[in-house]
Amino acid sequence: MAHQAHAYHMVDPSPWPITGATAALLVTSGLAAWFHFNSMILILMGLTLLLLTMYQWWRDIIRESTFQGHHTLPVQKSLRYGMILFITSEVFFFLGFFWAFYHSSLAPTPELGGLWPPTGITPLDPFEVPLLNTAVLLASGITVTWAHHSLMEGQRKEAIQSLFITVLLGLYFTALQATEYYESPFTIADGAYGSTFFVATGFHGLHVIIGSTFLIVCLVRQTQYHFTSNHHFGFEAAAWYWHFVDVVWLFLYVSIYWWGS
C-alpha cells in the first residue's frame, strides 16, 4: 500500500474535464445553431451534458474534501489562489465588454447618427426595474455576508436561513432581468447599442445564474453538515464570486443603464 509523504492532493484520473469541455462545445455550437437555424437540439444536448458533469464533478470533490480529508491546509491555500486568479480573469472578461460599450458611446460614428443612444433607440428607464435589480443584488450581498459570519460563529440555523434568502434574491434578480429583456423596446440586433447592452448584461445574468447554482449547492451542503466554522472553502469561494457579481452589476448599472441612457 502506497503512502504519501506530503500534504498535497494527488487527484485521481477523472472523465469530467473532457465531458465538461464537450458540453461547452455543444452549448456554444448550439447557441450559433439556435441563432441562425432556430434549432435548439444541440444547445439542449450541451446543457444536459453540462448539468450531468456538474453534478458528478461536484459529488467527487465533496467526497474527496469532506469525507476523505484530501483538502488539507496547503490544498485549501492553493484553491484560494486559484479562485482569486479565476475572478481576476473574469474581471478582464467584463473589461472587454465595457471597452466595447465606451468605444461606441464616447465617440458615436455617423452610422449611429453621431449620438448616443443612437437614433431610433428608446433606452430603458434606469430608475425602474434596473434600480430594483440593484437593490435586490445589494441586499443579496448583505445576506451572503450574514451567512458567512453565521457560519464562522457556528450559528448553523442562521447560516441556512440567510443563505436561503440569498438564493431567493438571486433567483428574483434573474426573473426581473428576464422580464426586462422580454419587454425591452430594442433587441440584440439593434446595432452597437443593442449588442453591447445585451451581451454585457446577458453575460452578467449568466454569472448570476452560475452564482445562484453555486450558492444552492452550498445551501444543500450546509444542511448536510459539510461545513465547519473553520473549514468551509466551498462556501467562501461562492461568497467571493457573489460579491464579484455584485460589483460588476454596479458598474453595469452606472455605465450602461444610467450614463448610457
UniProtKB/Swiss-Prot annotation:
<feature type="transmembrane region" description="Helical; Name=V">
    <location>
        <begin position="156"/>
        <end position="183"/>
    </location>
</feature>
<feature type="topological domain" description="Mitochondrial matrix">
    <location>
        <begin position="1"/>
        <end position="15"/>
    </location>
</feature>
<feature type="transmembrane region" description="Helical; Name=II">
    <location>
        <begin position="41"/>
        <end position="66"/>
    </location>
</feature>
<feature type="topological domain" description="Mitochondrial matrix">
    <location>
        <begin position="224"/>
        <end position="232"/>
    </location>
</feature>
<feature type="topological domain" description="Mitochondrial intermembrane">
    <location>
        <begin position="35"/>
        <end position="40"/>
    </location>
</feature>
<feature type="transmembrane region" description="Helical; Name=VII">
    <location>
        <begin position="233"/>
        <end position="256"/>
    </location>
</feature>
<keyword id="KW-1133">Transmembrane helix</keyword>
<protein>
    <recommendedName>
        <fullName>Cytochrome c oxidase subunit 3</fullName>
        <ecNumber>7.1.1.9</ecNumber>
    </recommendedName>
</protein>
<feature type="transmembrane region" description="Helical; Name=IV">
    <location>
        <begin position="129"/>
        <end position="152"/>
    </location>
</feature>
<feature type="transmembrane region" description="Helical; Name=III">
    <location>
        <begin position="73"/>
        <end position="105"/>
    </location>
</feature>
<feature type="topological domain" description="Mitochondrial intermembrane">
    <location>
        <begin position="184"/>
        <end position="190"/>
    </location>
</feature>
<feature type="topological domain" description="Mitochondrial intermembrane">
    <location>
        <begin position="257"/>
        <end position="261"/>
    </location>
</feature>
<dbReference type="InterPro" id="IPR000298">
    <property type="entry name" value="Cyt_c_oxidase-like_su3"/>
</dbReference>
<dbReference type="InterPro" id="IPR033945">
    <property type="entry name" value="Cyt_c_oxase_su3_dom"/>
</dbReference>
<comment type="similarity">
    <text>Belongs to the cytochrome c oxidase subunit 3 family.</text>
</comment>
<comment type="function">
    <text>Component of the cytochrome c oxidase, the last enzyme in the mitochondrial electron transport chain which drives oxidative phosphorylation. The respiratory chain contains 3 multisubunit complexes succinate dehydrogenase (complex II, CII), ubiquinol-cytochrome c oxidoreductase (cytochrome b-c1 complex, complex III, CIII) and cytochrome c oxidase (complex IV, CIV), that cooperate to transfer electrons derived from NADH and succinate to molecular oxygen, creating an electrochemical gradient over the inner membrane that drives transmembrane transport and the ATP synthase.</text>
</comment>
<dbReference type="InterPro" id="IPR013833">
    <property type="entry name" value="Cyt_c_oxidase_su3_a-hlx"/>
</dbReference>
<comment type="subunit">
    <text>Component of the cytochrome c oxidase (complex IV, CIV), a multisubunit enzyme composed of 14 subunits. The complex is composed of a catalytic core of 3 subunits MT-CO1, MT-CO2 and MT-CO3, encoded in the mitochondrial DNA, and 11 supernumerary subunits COX4I, COX5A, COX5B, COX6A, COX6B, COX6C, COX7A, COX7B, COX7C, COX8 and NDUFA4, which are encoded in the nuclear genome.</text>
</comment>
<dbReference type="InterPro" id="IPR024791">
    <property type="entry name" value="Cyt_c/ubiquinol_Oxase_su3"/>
</dbReference>
<feature type="topological domain" description="Mitochondrial matrix">
    <location>
        <begin position="153"/>
        <end position="155"/>
    </location>
</feature>
<dbReference type="GO" id="GO:0045277">
    <property type="term" value="C:respiratory chain complex IV"/>
</dbReference>
<dbReference type="GO" id="GO:0004129">
    <property type="term" value="F:cytochrome-c oxidase activity"/>
</dbReference>
<feature type="topological domain" description="Mitochondrial matrix">
    <location>
        <begin position="67"/>
        <end position="72"/>
    </location>
</feature>
<keyword id="KW-0999">Mitochondrion inner membrane</keyword>
<feature type="transmembrane region" description="Helical; Name=I">
    <location>
        <begin position="16"/>
        <end position="34"/>
    </location>
</feature>
<keyword id="KW-0812">Transmembrane</keyword>
<keyword id="KW-0472">Membrane</keyword>
<keyword id="KW-1278">Translocase</keyword>
<keyword id="KW-0496">Mitochondrion</keyword>
<feature type="transmembrane region" description="Helical; Name=VI">
    <location>
        <begin position="191"/>
        <end position="223"/>
    </location>
</feature>
<dbReference type="GO" id="GO:0005743">
    <property type="term" value="C:mitochondrial inner membrane"/>
</dbReference>
<dbReference type="Pfam" id="PF00510">
    <property type="entry name" value="COX3"/>
</dbReference>
<dbReference type="InterPro" id="IPR035973">
    <property type="entry name" value="Cyt_c_oxidase_su3-like_sf"/>
</dbReference>
<feature type="topological domain" description="Mitochondrial intermembrane">
    <location>
        <begin position="106"/>
        <end position="128"/>
    </location>
</feature>
<dbReference type="GO" id="GO:0006123">
    <property type="term" value="P:mitochondrial electron transport, cytochrome c to oxygen"/>
</dbReference>
